[in-house]
Amino acid sequence: MTAKTIFDKLWDRHVVAGNEGEPQLLYIDLHVIHEVTSPQAFQGLRDAGRSVRRRDLTYGTLDHNVPTKDIFNIQDLISKKQIDTFTKNVKEFGIPAEAHGGKGQGIVHMVAPESGRTQPGKTIVCGDSHTATNGAFGAIAFGIGTSEVEHVLATQTIWQVKPKRMKIEFQGHPQKGVYSKDFILALIAKYGVDAGVGYAVEYTGNAISDLSMEERMTICNMSIEFGAKMGQMNPDEKTYDYVKGREYAPENFDEAVSKWEKLVSDSDAVYDKVLTLDVSQLKPMVTWGTNPGMGLEFGEEFPKINDDLNYERAYQYMDLKPGQTASDIDLGYIFIGSCTNARLGDLEEAAKIIKGNHIADGLTGIVVPGSRPVKIADEELGLDKIFKNAGFEWREPVCSACLGMNPDQIPAYVHCASTSNRNFEGRQGHNARTHLCSPAMAAAAAIAGKFVDVREIV
């Protein structure tokens, strides 16, 4: 019997039609939708007189456009229209969805796992690239376009060409103060933002096994910034423990686990490419430029331009120079949130550093839990008080300042330490300057007023 990767096992069992090397029709186990990429898809169904084929396998939430100060006071007309249209569509087509302001509302890539809908062995799609987050559970999960959203709504299938297989081994035990966010930023900095193009990435190694499910989701989330189609990990006891007891966990849980345990890569499975990264000596990462690959370990000097026009443009946009270091960046804003790092564990790590301290003069800091359940859990632990006492604003749970699509935008020309996943030009607002880092690094920077080595604090 031919040895297979977890990706091969899951892909092959979901093929409805087609041969490998050609477009294949895949069955989809979970389709998650939000207000930005679904309106045209629903209108397409309406125009064609079609219904949603599997409403029970579809799930929606509002996240991108929702304000975080007063979630019901939506001033932007386009945002309001998208939210109102989404609410109308899910009601008309009978799709289960979190109510605006409801107990389960949050970022789409967080509420699916938190509700127990994300499970090993599933194929999961959403009209959003960071759907790869769900791959941490041993699922095939990837983002799709709006026309594909319509196709999945109508047929519960999607045409795809099977990607190649890449294995990435994270080896070693990280130093205290180094987190999974640093793992993935280091990987992208070393190999580039296009190294994963055309691949389904499997993350493995003892450094992955040691991570919590929340930390694993951070890595799979940023598979897209690595250029990959998707990222996934083999399920284990941590995976099963996370899913167990959640609202949509399987009723016959032990039976489900016995099946999930078979959904792992065979030891002699063959990959098209294998990369390794030793994290034992890794330092905290900070990006300096305008893509996630422009990152360095703390203390390293920003690189020379060397006729690289992308670097030259990045330096101009960020108002930085070769030879400077992260500690030279004049920070004005701190954002702790996003589908990359707004889970309970992320905010707990940041709160440990913030507790008993105060945000530096001249800085604005906001903390935005990624979902209502996380916000409630944070407040039960008193984390909200820690942040507010330190001078942070404690906001309502949605996408927030990850992207300039809602009121939480970073002012022009202001440098922001951000726990999000993208630092493109204008990503957080017109002419905003984004520096990606871990929640712990962002918290330490908030206190010091500049980037510092969090290893000296934790």
From Swiss-Prot:
Its EC number is 4.2.1.33. GO terms for biological process: L-leucine biosynthetic process. Transmembrane segments: none annotated. Binds 1 [4Fe-4S] cluster per subunit. It catalyses: (2R,3S)-3-isopropylmalate = (2S)-2-isopropylmalate. Pathway: Amino-acid biosynthesis; L-leucine biosynthesis; L-leucine from 3-methyl-2-oxobutanoate: step 2/4. [4Fe-4S] cluster binds at C339, C399, C402. It holds the Pfam family Aconitase. Keywords: 4Fe-4S, Amino-acid biosynthesis, Branched-chain amino acid biosynthesis, Iron, Iron-sulfur, Leucine biosynthesis, Lyase, Metal-binding. Gene3D superfamilies: Aconitase, domain 3. Its cofactor is [4Fe-4S] cluster. It is an enzyme of class 4 (lyase). GO terms for molecular function: 3-isopropylmalate dehydratase activity; 4 iron, 4 sulfur cluster binding; metal ion binding. It comes from the Bacteria. Belongs to the aconitase/IPM isomerase family. LeuC type 1 subfamily. HAMAP family: LeuC_type1. Catalyzes the isomerization between 2-isopropylmalate and 3-isopropylmalate, via the formation of 2-isopropylmaleate. NCBIfam families: leuC (TIGR00170), PRK05478.1 (NF004016), PRK12466.1 (NF009116). Heterodimer of LeuC and LeuD. This is 3-isopropylmalate dehydratase large subunit. It comes from Lactococcus lactis subsp. cremoris (strain SK11). The gene is leuC.
